[in-house]
Amino acid sequence: REMLPTKLEDLIAANALFRPGPMDLIPAFCSRKNGHEKVPKVHEIIDRYTEETHGIMVYQEQVMQIVHGLGDIPLRDAYTLIKAIGKKKHRVINANRPKFVNGAVQKGMDEGLANDLFDLILKFAGYGFNKSHSVAYAVLSYQTAWLKAHYPAAFMAAAFSSDMDNTDRLET
């Protein structure tokens, strides 16, 4: 409700944000999207990949691009890192931290900030959504809401007939 979506991209981001990893960032996203809070400039590489999401890592692809661009980690290894975080493979995670931090420091980022960013990536990547899934769910959600708003009787008839064999669900 606080997001006040004005375009499909807002619904796409909402789908990705409502996950355990990035969920804590919803208030900041909404505030920045609606112009109540300025988007902070962190580093040109991070800013480039998070511009469309108001300075917040929302999609797995953004995280991979940041790991690649800032940490000088090849994209295939960035993908492997994202998957390792999701599966809690600490050996892979721990092997990539110094690579990422060193790459970020070489690109002008403070070492402490680079470590904090890696920690944020760890928190996000375990639950983050990729953009293509968010797009699919957002389009389906939008179409469903539109049908329910403009053709409520037909929508409810279709919803009931899809659950025809589940009388418990039809009663609620």
Please report, for each region that a protein language model flagged, where it lies by residue.
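Noncatalytic, beta-rich nucleic-acid-contacting surfaces in large DNA/RNA-processing enzymes
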Residues: R1-T172
